[in-house]
Amino acid sequence: MHISEGILSPAVLAGGAALATVGVAIGLKKLDYEAIPRVAILSAAFFVASLIHVPVGPVGAHLVLNGLMGLLLGWTAFPAILVALFLQALLFQFGGLTGLGVNTVTMAAPAVICFYTYRCFLRTRGLLASVAAFACGVTGILLSGLLVAAALITTGQAFIVAVELVLLAHIPIMIMEGIITLFIFLFLKKVRPEVLEDIYR
């Protein structure tokens, strides 16, 4: 869901950079030594998943995995996503360096929101936890789409048509991400339940 370089206004870019700085600072403060491998693995997964993208106007449609990252990382999703986006901008010119802050916020902020919204349900057993895991994947993409839409509309009314295309293009991705998040949640619950217990204690 990268916003291409040269699209957003300076005010939106500055605001995104400021919010990203705050989010990354909080994420680094909450990052403990034991969580570093988990953060690194999910950052790498995000990097690979979002490389396969389809251009939709000024935005690329692709898997984001931010619902999953929110489920497993919380605030540390901010530095994880920032590192992946920085490498993509540097190596492949995806999103560009000037839009790094906005792109980080549009993908990491929903991850944090998902973490706090669903963690009380993810602690439970049975169907409710599974529904929450699926909803976490869907919500991450939905909120990212809305934030991208807000950034584009704030920049100019000319992007309204592009906003509609972006939101429509991400509907199937929402379902895919919900299924992926649910599958990984159930896998961890069965194979490594202590990981989830440590996150949601």
Regions found by a protein language model. Give the residues of each.
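Alpha-helix C-terminal capping segments
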Residues: M69-T76
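Hydrophobic transmembrane alpha-helices
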Residues: M1-L68
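Hydrophobic alpha-helical transmembrane segments
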Residues: A11-A14, I36-I41, F78-L82, L100-V105, ...
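C-terminal transmembrane helix-loop-helix hairpin of multi-pass membrane proteins
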Residues: V131-L142, A149, T155, F159-R201
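Short helix-perturbing small/polar motifs within transmembrane alpha-helices
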Residues: N103-V148
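Small-polar-interrupted transmembrane alpha-helices in polytopic inner-membrane proteins
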Residues: S43-F47, A77-L90
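Interfacial aromatic-anchored transmembrane helix boundaries in multi-pass membrane proteins
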Residues: L51-V59, V83-C114
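Hydrophobic cores of alpha-helical transmembrane segments in multi-pass inner/ER membrane proteins
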Residues: A14-A20, A108-T117, I175-F187
